[in-house]
């Protein structure tokens, strides 16, 4: 079990360090900033690379919502769910802490949002709580469907990380303006702990919506789509 939890810790660390790090350090870099597209690609690439690296050890979840969805779908034993969540959240916090130290090394640094998720005043586009709730539920549900489908016995072998990585990239392209994209409670928790206090006050949504979406996605797959 230790090797599985270690894989989830380091996989989630890489997701937050690479994805949120690209948003914090590189998205708006003068003249050469990578922008929304670059950040979306960064998140997708973190999952793709670590899924190939450690997916064979733990399943490559790196996300409490994914672990819940796979539990509902019968792919992860229920007894493993909470240990996976703990490893994922700790990995996210460790990555966010290091990003905070790196980012604070620049003159004029302000924690600000620190790539945190939010709605209302904390939404990049000023979207409401309801908009944030809906988009996070819907996108997480589809993310679970992508994961379950691409890792099923019916899918071509060896290509699941590519589908999952590109799926997460698309999710970010759609929802960065709305919530700064979560679909991952661990990712949201890690950076919220080091951002402005307001981010913590809205963190509940980025647990509730992805977890609800994960259950919906798993039910859709099991009831309507899956045969494995």
Curated annotation (Swiss-Prot):
GO CC terms of this entry: plasma membrane
Record-marked site positions (Selectivity filter): 43, 172, 181, 187
UniProt catalytic activity: H2O(in) = H2O(out)
Keywords: Cell inner membrane, Cell membrane, Membrane, Repeat, Transmembrane, Transmembrane helix, Transport
Site annotation Involved in tetramerization or stability of the tetramer: residues: 20
Compartment(s) where it occurs, according to its Swiss-Prot or TrEMBL record: Cell inner membrane
Molecular function as annotated in GO: water channel activity
Membrane-traversing stretches: 1-21, 23-43, 82-102, 129-149, 154-174, 205-225
Main location: membrane
Short sequence motif named NPA 2, residue ranges: 184-186
Tagged with keyword Cell inner membrane: yes
NPA 1, short sequence motif: residues: 63-65
Domain of life: Bacteria
The record's note on its domains: Aquaporins contain two tandem repeats each containing three membrane-spanning domains and a pore-forming loop with the signature motif Asn-Pro-Ala (NPA).
Function: Channel that permits osmotically driven movement of water in both directions. It is involved in the osmoregulation and in the maintenance of cell turgor during volume expansion in rapidly growing cells. It mediates rapid entry or exit of water in response to abrupt changes in osmolarity.
Assembly: Homotetramer.
PANTHER family noted in UniProt: AQUAPORIN TRANSPORTER (PTHR19139), MIP17260P (PTHR19139:SF199)
Protein name: Aquaporin Z
The organism of origin for this protein: Brucella abortus (strain 2308)
């Amino acid at each position: 079990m230790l090797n599985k939890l270690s894989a989830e810790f380091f996989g989630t660390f890489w997701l937050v360090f690479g994805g949120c790090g690209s948003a914090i350090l590189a998205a708006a870099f003068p003249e050469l900033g990578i922008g929304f597209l670059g950040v979306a690609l960064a998140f997708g690439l973190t999952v793709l690379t670590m899924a190939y690296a450690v997916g064979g050890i733990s399943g490559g979840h790196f996300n409490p919502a994914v672990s819940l969805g796979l539990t509902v779908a019968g792919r992860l034993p229920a007894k493993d769910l909470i240990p996976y969540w703990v490893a994922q959240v700790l990995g996210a916090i460790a990555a966010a802490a290091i990003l905070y130290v790196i980012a604070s090394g620049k003159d004029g640094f302000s924690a600000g949002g620190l790539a945190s998720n939010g709605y209302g005043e904390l939404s990049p586009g000023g979207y409401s709580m309801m908009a944030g709730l809906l988009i996070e539920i819907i996108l997480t549900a589809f993310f679970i469907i992508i994961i379950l489908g691409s890792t099923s016995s019916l899918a071509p072998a060896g290509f699941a990380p590519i589908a999952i990585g590109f799926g997460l990239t698309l999710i970010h392209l759609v929802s960065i303006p709305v919530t700064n994209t979560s679909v991952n409670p661990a990712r949201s928790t890690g950076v919220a702990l080091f951002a402005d206090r307001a981010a913590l006050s809205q963190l509940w949504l980025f647990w509730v919506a992805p977890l609800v979406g994960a259950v919906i996605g798993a039910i859709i797959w099991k009831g309507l789509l899956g045969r494995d």
